[in-house]
Regions:
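C-terminal motif of bacterial Sec signal peptides marking the signal peptidase cleavage site
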Residues: 23-25
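Catalytic-loop region of hydrolases
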Residues: 30-125, 131-134
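Accessory cap/linker subdomain of secreted extracellular hydrolases
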Residues: 49-52, 258-367
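Short, surface-exposed "cap/lid" segments of acyl-processing enzymes
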Residues: 119-126, 130-165
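Alpha/beta-hydrolase active-site loop
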Residues: 190-213
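C-terminal catalytic histidine-bearing segment of alpha/beta-hydrolase fold enzymes
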Residues: 350, 355-361, 381-434
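Short beta-strand/loop motif that positions the catalytic acidic residue
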Residues: 370, 375-382
Length: 434
């Protein structure tokens, strides 16, 4: 992948200082009367397209888990056998999320920013910023979201559960990723780590000067990174990008990564060798992502069962359906019923090319070890992202400053709720230390 010529942060900040003079009459106070969409901005900054204020007395109706309103999801997963392996209940976790949300009013800003696509062409992407309505924050948290199916679940279109942390005094930044939000008509390059890491970091680079010019006060420059599932792996890729290319400009306070496919090849090969995919949509998602994101000259029609290949545009690329709905449409967890005979043949030339791309896009294949402190969470009961990812990370990153939290926390989504709850606790402890 070619090297991108970024505008230095120092230049962005000098632009922001000049525009701050124009914005000096805009104050937050107690009235929360700043219209962010009307503020003058630089073309390289985040551009607000919609704004709303939320009191968060309860989980918003557009706060989803697998396409189901989060407020209802606790009741749904209480019935799951996988949940009963957890040491806590769905109801208690959901209530805890509600409890720590009842602190401040927040402002949600959906908007666009510039980044690059898999061909290295400029592309306008979208995302959401959630901040305390008084305009005062402790730090910025850059969040990489988990795997979604429908565009309604893209952060710019909904209220991510992690956004509740804004009420603790954090600015939350949520990129949609290429293929969602304003680019929903494009194929998402699933698990193409270097590209998605750039897309995520570009939003931070666009939001930071915008917030400064708007008068948002962030007490500390060091940022936090956070993500679960696909977002967990991508969060580690963002950490790598910052520590490799932005170490003088961006300082990381801490990284929170949970349930991530840090070894994409091992995750996918797990489906093939066991001939079981508990999360069926992952099979076509990974294959399509590797082909599109790495410009591989491979024909998916030869590698998938006809009924999957013929429906992938409708089921997946239309962005109309949640992952749960697509899993139901696929109708099987048997991998050889999803992949063709050639697709199941790990010795074939085509699968070999796929596996090379998966290795390239596995964060554990990088010649790198995290420098900033990391909190790495994984449920040992995870049926979607095999626990082998976390155990391999522990073996690989032996000298890194990592706090591991491995336990029987239920399935993948149950682990997600536990992860968010544990991050909230760690953030509270961090504030007490200061």
């Amino acid at each position: 992948m070619k090297s991108k010529k970024y505008i230095p942060i120092a230049k962005l900040l000098s632009i922001s200082l000049s525009l701050t003079l124009l914005l000096s009459s805009c104050t937050f106070g107690d009235n929360f009367d700043v219209d962010f969409s009307s503020l003058p901005t630089d073309s390289t900054w985040f551009k607000v397209t919609s704004q709303r204020t939320s009191t968060l007395d309860e989980l918003p109706a557009d706060c989803y888990i697998e396409g189901v309103p989060a407020a209802e999801y606790g009741q749904k997963i209480e019935q799951s056998p996988m949940w009963r392996t957890s040491s806590t209940s769905a109801a208690s976790v959901m209530q805890e999320i509600l409890d720590f949300s009842n602190r401040r009013t927040v402002i949600e800003l959906s908007g666009t920013y510039w980044s690059v696509d898999e061909e290295w062409n400029d592309v306008q992407l979208s995302g959401k910023v959630v901040l305390p309505a008084d305009g005062k924050a402790e730090r910025i948290i850059l969040v990489s979201h988990y795997t979604i199916g429908s565009n309604a679940e893209a952060p710019s279109r909904c209220f991510p559960i992690e956004a509740m942390l804004a009420k603790m005094g954090y600015v939350m930044i949520f990129p949609d990723y290429l293929g969602y939000g304003v680019t929903a008509d494009r194929v998402h390059p699933y698990l193409v780590m270097d590209l998605t890491a750039i897309n995520v970091l570009d939003m931070y680079l666009a939001v930071r000067p915008f917030l400064e010019a708007a008068g948002v006060e962030v007490a500390h420059d060091e940022i936090l990174l956070m993500g679960y599932s696909q977002g967990g792996a991508n969060t580690m890729a963002v950490q790598h990008l910052i520590e490799a290319a932005y170490y003088d400009e961006i300082k990381i306070r801490r990284v929170f990564a949970g349930g991530g496919p840090y070894d994409v090849l091992a995750t996918y090969d797990h489906f093939v060798t066991r001939d079981t995919a508990d999360y069926p949509i992952a099979v076509p998602l990974v294959m399509q992502g590797m082909i599109i994101g790495n410009n591989l000259d491979l024909n998916m029609e030869q590698l998938m069962q006809p009924y999957v290949y013929e429906n992938i545009d409708y089921w997946v690329n239309s962005k109309q359906f949640t992952t749960a709905q697509v899993n139901k449409a696929i109708g099987t967890k048997i991998t050889h019923n999803i992949l063709s005979e050639k697709g199941m043949d790990r010795t074939s030339e085509e699968v070999s090319e796929l596996y090379k791309a998966m290795t390239t896009n596995s964060i554990l294949s990088y010649s790198w070890e995290p420098q900033a402190p990391v909190y790495l969470f994984h449920s040992m009961d995870d049926e979607v992202v095999t626990f082998a990812n976390a155990s391999r990370a522990r073996v690989k990153w032996t000298n890194a400053n990592i706090q591991y939290n491995f336990g029987h926390y239920g399935g993948h989504i149950q682990g997600y709720l536990r992860f968010v709850s544990s991050v909230k606790t760690l953030l509270e402890q961090d504030r007490e230390i200061k």
